[in-house]
């Protein structure tokens, strides 16, 4: 949804994905597809190199890769922990670092990191995800402080549960770790803390990203902006 919205606004979009879904999106919007694994440093570098080779510069970076693993700390696989940090924290750092020279040279850049309400608060059984998303908020703030003098803004969007495969895939895991039926997970786990009892739609996140990349948001930087249906209002 984010790639589609930015393309609709006139951006030339580079889509990176580990599977064919990204290729389909890129083809539909007339963008460039780069296959890669964000857990690998060489693939992160190749992505930025491809964007620079095709378009000459980079104006906007959206870090949106992520996945979930539900487990207690006691049972959390160490290799899973390392992979989650690589995809959701190290990759955004590397991509920011690789895009920075082009943004600095043109004195304009927009970095939008898709964090989560779990980058601001915590829940049990999600240590890897929560640690990575908290770290991403910290990276965002540091990038904002360093980028202010050269026209680069950096912000994190922190949504509640978004209607995506990532959320769909964790229902069974949530039911298992909490000892409740799968049918109750959305109502009692995902929606219960929210003031507005629904999931966030992907298009809403895409609209927020587009706003942060617009001239109207030029003064917003270093912020962890909630789109949480009232989760953190308590």
Can you say where each PLM-predicted feature lies in the sequence?
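Canonical Rossmann dinucleotide-binding motif of NAD(H)/NADP(H)-dependent dehydrogenases/reductases
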Residues: 1-14
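Substrate-binding pocket helix/loop in short-chain dehydrogenase/reductase
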Residues: 72-73, 80-85, 111, 190
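Active-site helix of classical SDR
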Residues: 96, 132, 140
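Alpha-helical segment proximal to the catalytic Tyr-Lys
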Residues: 101, 145-146, 218
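Residue(s) in the substrate-gating loop at a strand-loop-helix junction
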Residues: 116
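Short C-terminal tail/terminal secondary-structure segment
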Residues: 121, 209, 221-234
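Short, small/polar-rich loop/turn modules that mediate ligand/substrate recognition or access, typified
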Residues: 148, 153, 220-222
């Amino acid at each position: 949804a984010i790639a589609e919205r930015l393309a609709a606004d006139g951006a030339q979009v580079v889509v990176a994905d580990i599977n064919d879904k990204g290729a389909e999106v890129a083809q539909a919007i007339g963008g460039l597809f780069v296959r890669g694994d964000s857990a690998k440093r060489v693939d992160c570098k190749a992505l930025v190199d491809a964007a620079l080779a095709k378009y000459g510069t980079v104006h906007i970076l959206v870090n949106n890769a992520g996945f979930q693993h539900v487990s207690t700390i006691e049972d959390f696989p160490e290799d899973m922990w390392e992979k989650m940090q690589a995809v959701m924290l190290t990759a955004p750092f590397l991509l920011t670092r690789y895009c920075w020279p082009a943004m600095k040279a043109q004195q304009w850049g927009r970095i939008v990191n898709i964090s989560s309400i779990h980058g601001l608060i915590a829940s049990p059984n999600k240590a890897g995800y929560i640690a990575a998303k908290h770290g991403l908020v910290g990276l965002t703030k540091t990038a904002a402080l360093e980028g202010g003098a050269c026209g680069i803004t950096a912000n994190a969007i922190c949504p509640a549960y978004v209607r995506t495969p990532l959320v769909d895939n964790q229902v069974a895991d949530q039911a298992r770790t909490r000892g409740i039926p799968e049918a109750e997970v959305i109502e009692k786990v995902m929606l219960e803390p929210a003031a507005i009892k629904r999931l966030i739609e992907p298009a809403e996140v895409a609209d927020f990203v587009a706003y942060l990349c617009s001239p109207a948001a030029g003064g917003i930087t270093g912020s962890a902006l909630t789109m949480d249906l009232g989760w953190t209002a308590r």
